[in-house]
């Protein structure tokens, strides 16, 4: 039986304790033995244990609902890395476009690339197998940080089929929320099954790139390069592109790359798409918001102002944005209004306001097939 933080067994155990301990407290209340002080102490222990079990059960349910922490290492802030693992440092051939300024597609609109890397024993060099579902994990060096970041890559079934042996696949880069973890996409969001369902209805077989957006030990940088801080935007854009291009059969033109994120990752997906039209053609913002909300940005008012989606839309980059929110989620639904108000051609913004739903992964997961269908209509398909 697995007692991982997000496992059903652990949730059942904790909820069971939350039910049993209050009952046990009532039953044992009049049966404790000893002097008055000892009896009082035992009763207090029973009450505290019952209360703690109830609080823990609530926290476990909230964590499983929102995908805040994927496991014990994530909860305790420990970086998951095999001591023998290779930390990839991409060698990018082109200049770094990820400083945060808006750009325009270069001629050909191609992403940064690196020299081809061979596969060894069925694995891309520098990657390890994640869970046996054609999903791989690498640790990647981040400029300005001594802590590497996780990058997961999940391949569609078509990738291994003979008919696609020499084809290049489009990529969707998935950004999680904060606090959160990349593996929330595989568990609470169940993204691989959702993509499979979308493909059954005609959606494109995307390669999924799932990077970590929060640098271990650093403040919440909201996918932005800030002075004297880890350059997380460079990692998410230039480095992720270079690693995918050198390790997998993927498209390197902007028409073959899109972004999707939820909550903070939704803001990041919209902001990075608007900032980097030379890299991305489309972005999906699920329950995001209109500007950096991290208190750390109080130190960087200019960067916070520049990071507002209303400001980024003024540059009118040639990209497409799809934003969705629930009417019962005031912060993200308010951001939809701002997006439609500030958009200018050739930028296009499509919005969807759901009448019901909360700020949680169960609602967002259900929306994913429609999100992949939208991306299929705004990104290029498999080529070669």
Question: Where in this protein do the model-derived segments appear?
Answer:
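Non-catalytic cap/lid and distal C-terminal segments of serine-dependent acyl enzymes
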Residues: 1-384
């Amino acid at each position: 039986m697995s007692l991982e933080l997000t496992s059903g067994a652990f949730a059942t155990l904790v909820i069971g304790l939350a039910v049993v301990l209050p009952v046990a407290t009532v039953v044992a209340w009049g049966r404790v033995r000893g002097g008055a002080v000892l009896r009082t102490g035992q009763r207090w222990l029973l009450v505290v244990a019952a209360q703690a079990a109830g609080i823990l059960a609530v926290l476990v349910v909230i964590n499983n609902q929102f995908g805040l922490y994927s496991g014990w290492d994530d909860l305790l802030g420990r970086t998951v890395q095999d001591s023998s693992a290779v930390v990839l440092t991409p060698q990018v051939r082109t200049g770094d476009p990820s400083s945060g300024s808006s750009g325009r597609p270069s001629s050909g609109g191609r992403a940064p690339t690196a020299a081809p890397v061979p596969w060894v024993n069925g694995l891309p060099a520098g990657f390890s197998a994640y869970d046996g579902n054609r999903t791989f994990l690498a640790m990647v060096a981040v400029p300005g940080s001594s802590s590497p970041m996780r990058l997961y890559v999940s391949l569609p079934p078509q990738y291994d089929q003979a008919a696609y042996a020499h084809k290049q696949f489009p990529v969707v880069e998935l950004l999680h929320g904060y606090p959160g973890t990349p593996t929330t996409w595989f568990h609470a969001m169940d993204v691989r099954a959702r993509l499979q369902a979308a493909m059954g209805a005609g959606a494109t077989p995307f390669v999924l790139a799932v990077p970590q957006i929060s640098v271990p030990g650093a403040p919440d940088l909201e996918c932005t390069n800030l002075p004297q801080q880890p350059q997380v935007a460079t990692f998410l854009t230039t480095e992720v592109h270079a690693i995918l291009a050198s390790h997998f059969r993927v498209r390197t033109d902007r028409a073959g790359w899109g972004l999707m994120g939820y909550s903070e990752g939704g803001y990041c997906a919209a902001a990075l798409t608007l900032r980097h039209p030379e890299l991305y053609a489309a972005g999906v913002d699920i329950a995001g918001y209109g500007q950096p909300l991290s208190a750390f940005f109080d130190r960087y008012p200019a960067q916070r102002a520049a990071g507002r989606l209303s400001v980024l839309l003024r540059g009118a980059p040639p990209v497409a944005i799809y934003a969705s929110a629930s009417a019962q989620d005031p912060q993200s639904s308010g951001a939809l209004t701002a997006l439609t108000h500030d958009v200018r051609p050739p930028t296009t913004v499509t919005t969807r306001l759901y009448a019901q739903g909360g700020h949680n992964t169960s609602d967002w997961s259900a929306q994913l097939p429609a999100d992949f269908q939208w991306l299929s209509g705004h990104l290029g398909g498999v080529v070669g």
